[in-house]
């Protein structure tokens, strides 16, 4: 067996010897045939939907005719010819449309193709179970990304019979993708104009269940099923997402925090890190020091003075350095905390990041819990870039805060000392650059509970220099 580098060298030598001065389809096909022979097997993708693993001996090229695994196609064009991948445009007999055939050496697919293969296999595995459950035949399968309607390629869609539609999500997807099927189902329902069944992986429905309990209109507009890898069963609305409130006590580190912040008082910001029982000192959202009662650590190294000088050059508005684009939401959070009283009438001495905590959840959104001067809880969700799931992610946080507010968990665990928390629903505030609210934002917000107090704040796109409120929709109080 030739090693990959020697194979590539051999292929390039053969290709160089065969390459004519002008393009010649016959020579191009011969190059293709030789390249196929250099590998023991190939994985073939047909239009990104069907995947076949075929031995090289089972692939034949006769003139412009291509045969493999029981398929026969006429080669129209060899669009890309590389040592480990080939893309061919070909047409079946009596067909007017061409297929795109992608050949990948061996059984290992590049990441996008492997992802597509996994999702395709999942979609196919659902077909028999859907037919049994709905009592009708699946007539169409759809997997492509529908950007026009905001439905990603992570959500297989199927049509069944004349009046039913299905949308599902693979158990192997990340948590935000699984939870996003609720939003995708709403958009799919508007497109397909049929009764939609939503299939959720068994054991991964806690967040969706919590949302549906709070959103009866959505719960009743769809049929909800769970998939255990073999069968479909009705979704049970019993166990929602698990959250908890960590005890909070301000660590006795004032002197050390003051010493570090004095190095660059206009640039460094102390923020409580409740899980570590420490104070996190940040430069435009990046942690440069962590102070607890036992020690001070420096995640980016020390001494701090040259580090801060370097960060000030690289992580600044208008910079093209990668550090200027890293962790932008943390930067926006930092600017918002620094100007909080200019944006919202809340207490600066009672701002808690990531409270309460979500057990086992992947939350890629920044949450702040604070309180108004007169004791009303305020939940702040921050997004620096467009995210179609923002309304429902914000709902998750608000539901958790409300559950713990009603139970008195915040006061019991040391939050808001000396402040009387009003027995009223928390106000939900969503903050993002005005042009970064997704076009579906208004439509999804309309599904939120009518009793939820909501405030949308759109800030300027140049928030890295200075935050300015361009839109304030809703009421605080």
How does the language model describe each region?
Residues 2-477:
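Charged, terminal alpha-helix-loop-beta segments
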């Amino acid at each position: 067996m030739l090693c990959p580098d020697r194979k590539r060298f051999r292929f390039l030598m053969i290709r160089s010897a065969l390459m004519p001065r002008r393009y010649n389809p016959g020579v191009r096909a011969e190059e293709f045939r030789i390249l196929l022979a250099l590998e023991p097997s190939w994985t073939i993708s047909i239009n990104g939907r069907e995947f076949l693993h075929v031995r090289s001996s089972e692939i034949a090229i006769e003139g412009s005719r291509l045969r493999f695994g029981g398929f026969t196609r006429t080669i129209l064009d060899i669009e890309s010819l590389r040592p480990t991948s080939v893309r061919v445009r070909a047409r079946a007999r009596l067909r007017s449309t061409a297929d795109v055939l992608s050949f990948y050496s061996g059984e290992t697919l590049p990441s996008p193709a492997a992802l597509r293969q996994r999702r395709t296999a999942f979609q196919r595995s659902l077909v028999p179970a859907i037919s049994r459950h709905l009592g009708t035949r699946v007539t169409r399968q759809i997997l492509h990304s529908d950007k026009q309607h905001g439905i990603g390629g992570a959500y297989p869609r199927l049509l069944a019979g004349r009046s039913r539609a299905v949308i599902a999500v693979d158990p192997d997807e990340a948590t935000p993708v699984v939870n996003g099927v609720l939003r995708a189902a709403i958009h799919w329902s508007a497109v397909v104009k049929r009764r939609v069944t939503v299939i959720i992986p068994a054991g991964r429905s806690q967040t969706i269940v919590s949302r549906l309990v709070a959103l009866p209109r959505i719960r009743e507009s769809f049929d909800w099923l769970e998939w255990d890898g073999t069968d479909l069963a009705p979704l049970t609305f019993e166990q929602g997402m698990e959250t908890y409130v960590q005890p909070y006590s301000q660590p006795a580190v004032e002197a050390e925090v003051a010493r570090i912040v004095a190095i660059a008082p206009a640039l460094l910001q102390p923020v409580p890190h409740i899980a570590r029982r420490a104070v996190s000192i940040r430069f435009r959202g990046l942690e440069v020091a962590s102070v607890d009662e036992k020690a001070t650590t420096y995640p980016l190294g020390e001494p701090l003075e040259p580090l801060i000088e370097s960060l000030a050059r690289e992580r600044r508005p208008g910079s093209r350095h990668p550090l200027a684009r890293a962790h932008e939401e943390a930067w926006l959070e930092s600017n918002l905390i620094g100007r909080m009283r200019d944006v919202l009438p809340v207490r600066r001495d009672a701002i808690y990041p990531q409270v309460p905590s979500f057990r086992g959840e992947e939350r890629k959104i920044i949450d702040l819990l604070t309180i108004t001067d007169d004791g009303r809880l305020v939940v702040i969700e921050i997004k620096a870039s467009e995210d179609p799931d923002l309304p429902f992610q914000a709902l998750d946080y608000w539901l958790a805060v409300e559950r713990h507010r009603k139970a008195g968990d915040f006061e019991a665990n040391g939050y808001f000392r000396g402040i009387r928390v009003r027995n009223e629903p928390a106000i939900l505030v969503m903050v993002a650059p005005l042009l970064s609210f997704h076009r579906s934002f208004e439509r999804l917000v309309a599904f939120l509970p009518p009793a939820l107090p909501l405030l949308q704040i759109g800030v300027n796109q140049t928030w890295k220099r200075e935050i300015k409120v361009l839109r304030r929709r809703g009421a605080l109080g």
